[in-house]
Amino acid sequence: MVFPDLLPRRSTVQPVRLMGDERLRLFSGSANPELAQLVARYLGLAPGPLVRKSFADGELYVQIQESIRGCDVYLVQPTCSPVNDSLMELLILIDACRRASARQITAVLPYYGYARADRKTAGRESITAKLVANLITAAGVDRVLAMDLHSAQIQAYFDIPLDHVYGSPVLLQYIKEKQLGDMVIVSPDVGGVSRARAFAKKLDDAPLAIVDKRRQAPNEVEVMNVIGDVKGKTAILVDDMIDTAGTISEAAKVLLRQGAKEVYACATHAVFSSRAIDRLSDGTFTEVLVTNTIPVPPDRRFPQLRVLSVADLIGEAIWRIHEDSSVSSMFR
């Protein structure tokens, strides 16, 4: 995995003004309208008008309220909680745009739900991440723009063009501005080593550590061991998402017991389900850094939380796709 170099700081980025280009339209699903509004602002647009409602039986209805015939349409809809409703709404939006004769439809997925079901771990299971890709493609989308997919193989689940962008620039920029000094980048499990290593390289090749969780014998509790030196250092735990926060919270406690000075949590997607808020706000972490790919309502926020915006990054990617320019050059 290769992470991009840092983008220009937000204060130095000039919004792309496309108001005069009537071919580009952006619409927001209900999953994260705040992010869609910020992306539209970067592009010098306003999200297109649409009607969305639910019938008494739970069925969804969507109608585009302006002509999009011949337009390049971008639909911003992370498939986050409620996952099934968000996914179904995206499919309906795609179908509505296709039937309205849009020239090209791009699904902008800041967060890709079902991403962890990317392989079979037991017999008679579904590979749901692939199924979701099939559904999105079958609905009529032409292209997908996704951010920080859980695993690289998901890109191959789509038989249409997919542009993969990263939330790491905004996280790295924040950490660099903190000037934390003696840092160690930590993967909370063995599976995330490549992500943590790429993150460390962008921080002047900071040292790397791994929290390895294993059972010493059958029927014994799992034991966490730290591979690497964390004593006296500021530990930064890096992952793609924080869901229940069980693994990352236990990893942080192990790091502190091993002598880490303080621990930061760093992830693109703030899923924050179950007991996540209690675990993240109990004083174990100095700060918890996430982005706004998934909305975090006020009642789910806590003093250690920092929510960083990826709207400019997504907006820049949309502009480059629309102009047939390179997206990958953003990350060189």
UniProtKB/Swiss-Prot annotation:
Keywords: ATP-binding, Cytoplasm, Kinase, Magnesium, Metal-binding, Nucleotide biosynthesis, Nucleotide-binding, Transferase. The gene is prs. D-ribose 5-phosphate binds at residues 215, 239, 243-247. Its EC number is 2.7.6.1. GO terms for molecular function: ATP binding; kinase activity; magnesium ion binding; ribose phosphate diphosphokinase activity. ATP binds at residues 57-59. Binds 2 Mg(2+) ions per subunit. This is Ribose-phosphate pyrophosphokinase. Pathway: Metabolic intermediate biosynthesis; 5-phospho-alpha-D-ribose 1-diphosphate biosynthesis; 5-phospho-alpha-D-ribose 1-diphosphate from D-ribose 5-phosphate (route I): step 1/1. Its cofactor is Mg(2+). It is found in: Cytoplasm. The keyword ATP-binding applies. The active site is at 213. Homohexamer. PANTHER family: RIBOSE-PHOSPHATE DIPHOSPHOKINASE FAMILY MEMBER (PTHR10210), RIBOSE-PHOSPHATE PYROPHOSPHOKINASE 1, CHLOROPLASTIC (PTHR10210:SF41). It catalyses: D-ribose 5-phosphate + ATP = 5-phospho-alpha-D-ribose 1-diphosphate + AMP + H(+). HAMAP family: RibP_PPkinase_B (MF_00583_B). GO terms for cellular component: cytoplasm; ribose phosphate diphosphokinase complex. One of its GO terms (biological process) is 5-phosphoribose 1-diphosphate biosynthetic process. Mg(2+) 1 binds at residue 150. Involved in the biosynthesis of the central metabolite phospho-alpha-D-ribosyl-1-pyrophosphate (PRPP) via the transfer of pyrophosphoryl group from ATP to 1-hydroxyl of ribose-5-phosphate (Rib-5-P).
